């Protein structure tokens, strides 16, 4: 038989309550809480951050209260809110628990369910020493004289201060025990500041009574709060930094200041005046003029950073306001000082270095991802931008973050995340300090599970279903530290800052004279035109305009270092206007320094890329760095090719299929060209990527046309169709300005008439050429079949057998040579490979080509050298047909292939560089000669690609020294400060040596 639970068994035992102290059960009996009526009290006690500590302190409080315990016990049982405040307080703070035991009647303070306002705090602290308003010539609203000024004054003030601190802590902690409102961090910080102001006003009242005796106060003394107190974001336990201003700054003023500090430090907290001019070596009290003289002549940068948070606190508030009004203009111009940013950043690093390595991960204030990271970053941004934006003239860190976000200086999400992390870390700091009312910022050690568990409960951290409260706390600490460090790096060290502070103050406002002057200094040839672009970019009062105004000083300087800043700024305006609706664009430029700088390099160097980027804007986001390096290097050509084929295959309409393929080609072209221009890719990588995307688009177009034809006729294609790449396409060595040289080959399906098959294939080839060559927003794709048998007079498409017959009977030497580059690139793979096998007999003949063929090739080469060079071209600097240019190297390689491929199988290769490697391995040329040919081919290809990137259109001729050559040299990766002359000398030297090798091969 199951017995019903008894009344006694319904009462939770100490184990269920989480009480570990061996005396806990006896203590509960002694309190009279081991019964059914006390169950709500017991469960509330169990929720205290440290239930054992709370119970032990309650036992001491019961003893201290004596017969008055019954009143408190009754209140605990009936007033849920009071119970929550009391248990949370006693389970969180041994120091405030000790205070309550020492002053047991003070529990009545906890009956109050709201915070006293600033005036109530002031009245309460002043009443403790019976202070009254000071009379006399220097009377003011914050100057009082204590009626109690003897040694007992300190004890009275300490007790009253602790009462108020206890009430705040109880209200702050109550939500951990009962369902009470959570006090926002900013409310706690402001209340602690109001309490500190009231406390030091009372301390000053005692000082006036002690120093001035029966005489009216003979001086004006202003107490200026600095640091966290000045910013109204004080901790529970914190030094209060002050500066004193007096008129006159005589012995009486000094004694008043010293006495106030002494009383305050004994009764409340450490009062520190070390931020005064000259620090602890300087005079404790100065006149306003003395302060200003020091700040104008001697102050260091960090002192202006400290002044950012100054606030008249007590004493002569009018004098305090005069001080603030006089020093703040100097604060907002501090960023104009030489080396301002490096000095501030260096100071932050030095502070970080002071933290012992073993404590850096536990240090909330000074370690990595700590409170100081946030504060330094925010203060630096305020000082840099506050000189032209009064909205940033705020003192508290959280308010400053809000203002920075509202002004567009930081991202709204970044500001929100940083604020959340900052408030979380400050919450932990508050809880740690409350424990013993000690100034600490260090988290418990990892192996201190008891300490971490207490902190989790005190911070109101709850289990999340996967981890207990302690595990959640550890995860949150790590997550917030990483987030702070990441955002700190974006804000504090981002390269925008140093550039912005080097600009004239007017330049940030972009006033006409300042902007034109600055633009000319930065290398703009037409600064007035450039200024017009700036006005267009920053016009209006929109958030985008403000962000542009923030970015432009840095962007202009980066553009000024490019070959053509004027064109770059125009391009930037075009890109900005085209992406006006893309909210990510300006955010990326502002928050990712690499994106902004790389974009400026690209726009100021290339006429090829701006249109591509406007039509493929997502490429700009790839200018950022990822975890494994630049995002531009992420996609692989094979992946891009598969994506193009997949995208095109989704459409039945060839026009839409080709449009999809060309769109992806546009993105890939923008990516490759950007990475190339930024020096991230080597020449072979560029050529392979460009060739791969060309092949994919060609293959996609061919498949779409065939698919549409089959759908239209309702029958399978009457022939297999293959595209053979020739020239640079066959060698997978395309440049930006290269056409695609191809041959079209078909083979009728079984039972299909050849005439019908060829006619169909011609229709397919013509449509592919037409689709790919149609005008579009990306560079056109010219498919050139001019290398086919009989040239442009011959049939556009032939069957495989027709090709075999022609090459077997009629092939001329130049056609044989052209076949050395033949490679299957699109269409029917099996047919393409059969074509290659068929022409192998022609291009790699047994015994090599005849001497007559060699002589014919030499004759044609000589004619090309003399006749094909365009009129007016310089044979020394024409990258394709000039001396030591691409044609020279490729003809040399091909001649060696024709003569030796029958015996050296590795020469059966369509790629120039790979064939050169085979030539070297077979010792057909000396390694030194091969190196010269390779270097010349790479340099000529690089220069030819650079010409297209710079000019925006195909070109083979290097210009003479000047701005254009300088741009080509820069894009080609050549250090350049001489109009490109050094690059040109290098080009001539390399190609001249290669030409000597070419002449030896063709002369042998």
From Swiss-Prot:
Cofactor requirement: Mg(2+)
A single Gene Ontology CC term: cytosol
Alphabetic keyword roster: ATP-binding, Magnesium, Multifunctional enzyme, Nucleotide-binding, Nucleotidyltransferase, Transferase
Reaction(s) this enzyme catalyzes, per UniProt: [glutamine synthetase]-O(4)-(5'-adenylyl)-L-tyrosine + phosphate = [glutamine synthetase]-L-tyrosine + ADP; [glutamine synthetase]-L-tyrosine + ATP = [glutamine synthetase]-O(4)-(5'-adenylyl)-L-tyrosine + diphosphate
Segments of this protein annotated with the region Adenylyl transferase: 502-1004
NCBIfam families recorded: PRK14109.1
Protein name, UniProt field: Bifunctional glutamine synthetase adenylyltransferase/adenylyl-removing enzyme
Gene: glnE
């Amino acid at each position: 038989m199951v017995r019903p639970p008894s009344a006694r068994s319904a009462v939770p035992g100490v184990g269920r309550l989480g009480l570990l102290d061996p005396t806990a059960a006896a203590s509960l009996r002694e309190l009279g809480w081991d019964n059914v009526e006390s169950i709500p009290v017991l469960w509330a006690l169990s929720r205290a951050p440290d239930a054992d500590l709370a119970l032990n302190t309650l036992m001491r409080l019961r003893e201290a209260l004596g017969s008055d315990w019954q009143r408190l016990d009754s209140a605990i049982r009936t007033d849920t809110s009071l119970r929550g405040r009391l248990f949370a307080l006693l389970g969180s703070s041994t120091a405030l628990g000790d205070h309550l035991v020492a002053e047991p009647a003070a529990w009545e303070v906890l009956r109050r369910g709201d915070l006293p306002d600033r005036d109530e705090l002031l009245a309460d602290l002043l009443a403790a020493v019976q202070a009254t308003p000071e009379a006399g010539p220097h009377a003011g609203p914050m100057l009082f004289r204590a009626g109690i000024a003897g040694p007992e004054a300190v004890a009275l003030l300490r007790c009253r201060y602790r009462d108020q601190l206890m009430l705040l802590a109880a209200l702050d902690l109550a939500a951990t025990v009962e369902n009470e409102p959570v006090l926002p961090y900013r409310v706690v910080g402001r209340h602690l500041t109001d309490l500190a102001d009231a406390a030091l006003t009372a301390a000053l009242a005692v000082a006036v009574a002690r120093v001035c005796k029966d005489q009216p106060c003979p001086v004006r003394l202003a107490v200026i709060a600095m640091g966290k107190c000045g910013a109204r974001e004080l901790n529970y336990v914190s030094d209060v930094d002050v500066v004193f201003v007096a008129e006159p700054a005589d012995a009486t003023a000094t004694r008043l200041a010293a006495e106030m500090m002494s009383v305050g430090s004994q009764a409340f907290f450490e009062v520190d005046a070390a931020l005064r001019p000259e620090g602890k070596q300087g005079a404790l009290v100065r006149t306003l003029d003395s302060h200003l003289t020091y700040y104008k002549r001697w102050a260091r940068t960090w002192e202006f950073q400290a002044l950012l948070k100054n606030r008249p606190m007590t004493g002569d508030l009018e004098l305090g306001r005069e001080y603030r009004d006089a020093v703040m203009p100097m604060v907002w111009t501090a960023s104009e000082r030489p080396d301002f940013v490096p000095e501030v950043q260096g100071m932050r690093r030095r502070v970080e270095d002071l933290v012992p390595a073993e404590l850096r991960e536990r240090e909330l204030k000074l370690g990595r991802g700590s409170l100081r990271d946030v504060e330094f970053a925010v203060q630096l941004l305020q000082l840099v931008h506050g000189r032209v934006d009064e909205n940033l003239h705020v003192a508290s860190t959280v308010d400053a973050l809000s203002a920075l976000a509202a002004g567009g200086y930081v991202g709204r999400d970044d500001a929100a995340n940083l604020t959340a992390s900052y408030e979380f870390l400050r919450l932990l700091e508050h809880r740690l300090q409350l424990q013993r009312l000690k100034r600490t910022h260090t988290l418990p050690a990892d192996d201190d599970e008891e300490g971490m568990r207490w902190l989790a409960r005190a911070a109101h951290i709850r289990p999340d279903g996967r981890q207990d409260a302690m595990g959640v706390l550890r995860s949150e600490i790590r997550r917030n530290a990483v987030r702070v460090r990441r955002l700190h790096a974006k804000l504090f060290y981002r390269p925008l800052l140093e550039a912005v502070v080097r600009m004239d103050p007017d330049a940030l406002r972009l006033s006409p004279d300042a902007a034109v002057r600055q633009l000319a200094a930065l290398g703009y040839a037409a600064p007035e035109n450039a200024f017009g672009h700036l006005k267009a970019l920053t016009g209006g009062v929109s958030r985008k305009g403000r962000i542009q105004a923030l970015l432009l000083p840095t962007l202009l300087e980066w553009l000024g270092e490019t070959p053509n800043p004027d064109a770059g700024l125009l391009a930037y305006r075009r890109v900005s206007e085209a992406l006006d609706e893309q909210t990510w664009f300006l955010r990326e430029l502002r928050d990712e320094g690499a994106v902004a700088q790389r974009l400026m390099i690209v726009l100021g160097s290339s006429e090829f890329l701006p249109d591509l980027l406007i039509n493929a804007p997502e490429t700009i986001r790839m200018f950022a760095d990822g975890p494994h390096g630049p995002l531009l290097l992420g996609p692989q050509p094979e992946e891009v090719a598969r994506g193009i084929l997949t995208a095109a295959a989704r459409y039945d309409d060839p026009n839409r299929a080709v449009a999809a393929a060309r769109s992806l080609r546009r993105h890939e072209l923008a990516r490759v060209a950007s990475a190339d221009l930024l020096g991230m890719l080597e020449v072979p990588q560029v050529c392979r990527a460009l060739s791969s995307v060309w092949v994919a688009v060609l293959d996609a177009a061919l498949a779409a046309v065939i698919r549409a034809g089959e759908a239209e006729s309702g029958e399978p294609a009457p022939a297999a169709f293959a595209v053979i790449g020739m020239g640079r396409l066959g060698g997978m060595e395309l440049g930006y300005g290269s056409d695609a040289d191809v041959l079209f080959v078909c083979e009728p399906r079984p039972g299909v008439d050849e005439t019908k098959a060829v006619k169909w294939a011609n229709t397919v080839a013509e449509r592919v050429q037409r689709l790919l060559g149609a005008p579009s927003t990306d560079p056109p794709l010219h498919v050139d079949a001019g290398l086919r048998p009989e040239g442009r007079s011959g049939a556009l498409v032939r069957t495989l057998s027709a090709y075999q017959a022609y090459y077997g009977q009629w092939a001329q030497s130049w056609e044989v040579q052209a076949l050395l580059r033949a490679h299957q690139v699109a269409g029917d793979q099996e047919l393409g490979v059969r074509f290659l096998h068929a022409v192998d007999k022609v291009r790699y003949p047994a015994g090599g080509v005849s001497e007559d063929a060699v002589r014919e090739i030499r004759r044609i080469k000589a004619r090309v050298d003399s006749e094909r060079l365009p009129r007016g071209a310089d044979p020394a600097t024409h990258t394709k047909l000039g001396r030591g240019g691409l044609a020279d190297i490729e003809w040399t390689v091909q001649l060696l292939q024709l003569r030796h491929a029958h015996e050296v199988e590795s020469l059966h290769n369509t790629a120039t560089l790979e064939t050169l490697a085979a030539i070297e391995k077979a010792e057909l040329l000396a390694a030194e000669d091969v190196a010269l040919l390779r270097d010349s081919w790479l340099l000529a290809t690089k220069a030819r690609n650079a010409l297209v990137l710079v000019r925006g259109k195909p070109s083979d001729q290097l210009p003479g020294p000047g701005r254009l050559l300088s741009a080509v040299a820069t894009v080609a990766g050549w250090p350049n400060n001489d109009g490109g002359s050094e690059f040109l000398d290098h080009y001539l030297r390399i190609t001249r040596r290669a030409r000597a090798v070419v002449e030896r091969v063709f002369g042998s």
